[in-house]
A protein has these predicted regions:
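Loop/turn-to-beta-strand initiation segments
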Residues: 2-4, 351-355, 369-372, 395-401
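Active-site-proximal, substrate-binding regions of enzyme catalytic domains
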Residues: 2-118, 124-229
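Conserved RecA-like ASCE ATPase "motif II neighborhood" in helicase/translocase motors
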Residues: 14-16, 351-374, 379-388
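Conserved coupling/interface region of RecA-like P-loop/ASCE motor cores
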Residues: 39-70, 423-456
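N-terminal pre-P-loop "Q-motif" helix
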Residues: 231-251
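Pre-Walker A (Motif I) flank of P-loop NTPase domains
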Residues: 251-257
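P-loop (Walker A) phosphate-binding loop of NTP-binding proteins
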Residues: 261-262
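Conserved P-loop
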Residues: 268-343, 411-431
Length: 456
């Protein structure tokens, strides 16, 4: 059955190619959507760029035919601009001059002739109003991944026979030797993914554990389990796995995805390895550490803020500097005598260009070579932004995506549509991607913080 999908502006602002994702159905753009795209085309950042991409796509279709009558797209669907439905009545409580309500008028006006009609929007309130008016509404699902509980964690606990357990560090263990137990105590074969981290337990003594990683048809021991990057020693299994992923060369592990709640040392450990690789590595594996954080306030583009680039992004980078202060002042033997001396050391590192910070808006279109690139708070990125970063990685560059899918501050994103979860699910199984999700038990915050997390 052919459906008519009415597209809201916020869909095109996040996914400018969205019109091509509805198969051989009708795609309806209310005229007010074009008005909103026109008003956004000069905006700085991702919003303006996507508005321009959507407009260019519509211009290509305009050259092929009459958009008011409908133009066929490459996927077989028909795109049409709807300029009518101005006389459709809405409840008095819905002002007719509001763009969202004009979109509702289009949905209501065309459904008599073009059933079924589906409104596609990321606006939760608009979906609620649509339901009240008897209009089917949904989110844009093409970029949605599964619910967070079922998303790839990058780690598993598996069991193995005692004799195989004893041989693990020397020989590793074949995947077919690993097993899990179901509810009835029966042994079942685990589903494992390339580069997945394993907590290996001996079946006769489950308190004994080894840590490993899936490589081909075997689980192998961690290569960097004895490392202490920048003097930092891992405190739990998650940090050992994180260290392994970060210490691997850019050739073997050019992409690392780390998910977990605040306090699990995601940023701290990533910076520690970066400092070790850039400051203490004579081979010059990386030229610099580049740190970026997305501006969660999507409607407040950083380009409008006063000052130069570094002044603009300084508030965004304050948590990064806090971690740097803790790392640089962590050596008991070389602890700095006062705050001024510590700040002087940090300023020296920045002045030498060994650590650089940039806002996401300023790195679009650039390629990075021999760079240790940390993207903090990546859950506030769109899938399109993450794709743009990963596909720009130059030779010798390592990209580290950090974030918590449960702490999203950006409008129209959730735990299923954010860029971090999107990259995690689609890069699962890649031999070039290492992933780890830190557990709640691995949080290194104070007892008060942990108690508050449980209670509040």
């Amino acid at each position: 059955m052919i459906k008519s999908y009415v597209i809201d502006t916020n869909i095109l602002i996040q996914a400018p190619y969205a019109c091509q994702c509805f198969e051989e159905n009708r795609v309806i753009l209310p005229l007010v959507v074009l008005e909103e795209l026109d008003g956004l085309k000069k905006a700085e950042g991702e919003k303006g760029a996507n508005a321009r991409r959507a407009i260019r796509f519509l211009e290509k279709l305009r050259l092929k035919g009459d958009l008011l009558k409908g133009v066929q797209m490459e996927n077989g669907g028909i795109l049409r601009v709807e300029a009518n439905c101005v006389n459709v009545e809405l409840p008095e409580s819905l002002p007719e001059d509001k763009p969202d309500n004009r979109i509702l008028k289009v949905c209501k006006g065309i459904r008599e002739e073009e059933k079924p009609v589906v409104l596609v929007t990321k606006d939760l309130v608009l979906r609620l109003k649509a339901q009240i008016l008897g209009i089917e509404a949904q989110d844009f699902s093409t970029e949605q991944v599964i619910e967070e509980e079922g998303q790839y964690s990058g780690r598993q606990i598996c069991y193995v026979a005692e004799d195989k357990f004893k041989e693990f560090k020397k020989k590793g263990v074949h995947l077919k030797e690993l097993y899990l137990s179901d509810e009835d105590g029966n042994k079942i074969q685990p589903e494992l993914t390339e580069n997945e981290f394993i907590i290996l337990k001996a079946d006769q003594s489950v308190k004994k554990t080894h840590l490993g990683r899936v490589e081909g048809k075997k689980v192998v021991s961690l290569e960097f389990r004895k490392s202490q990057p920048y003097g930092i020693k891992p405190r739990n299994a998650g940090q050992y796995f994180l260290q392994e992923a970060l210490m691997k060369s850019a050739e073997k592990a050019p992409l690392v995805i780390v998910k977990g709640m605040a306090g699990t040392a995601k940023t701290f450990y990533s910076l520690a390895v970066g400092l070790e690789k850039v400051l203490n590595n004579p081979t010059g594996e990386y030229r610099r550490i580049l740190i970026c954080r997305p501006n969660a306030q999507f409607d407040q583009d950083i380009g409008f803020l006063p000052g130069d680039e570094q002044e603009k992004i300084s508030p965004l980078m304050r948590p990064i500097v806090d971690n740097l202060e803790q790392l640089i002042d962590s050596d008991e033997e070389e602890r700095y005598q006062d705050e001024q001396e510590l700040q002087g050391k940090i300023e020296e590192i920045f002045a030498r260009g060994l650590i650089q910070t940039e806002a996401m808006n300023f790195i679009r279109g650039r390629s990075f070579v021999k760079t240790y690139l940390i993207i903090d708070e990546a859950q506030n990125m769109t899938p399109n932004q993450v794709k743009g970063i990963i596909t720009r990685a130059g030779k010798g560059t390592k990209i580290v995506l950090l974030g918590d899918p449960n702490q999203i501050d950006r409008p129209f994103l959730d735990e299923r549509t954010n860029g971090l979860s999107y990259a995690s699910e689609y890069m699962k199984g890649s031999p070039l991607c290492y992933q780890i999700t830190m557990s709640t038990e691995e949080c290194e915050r104070s007892e008060l913080a942990m108690d508050a997390i449980r209670r509040l």
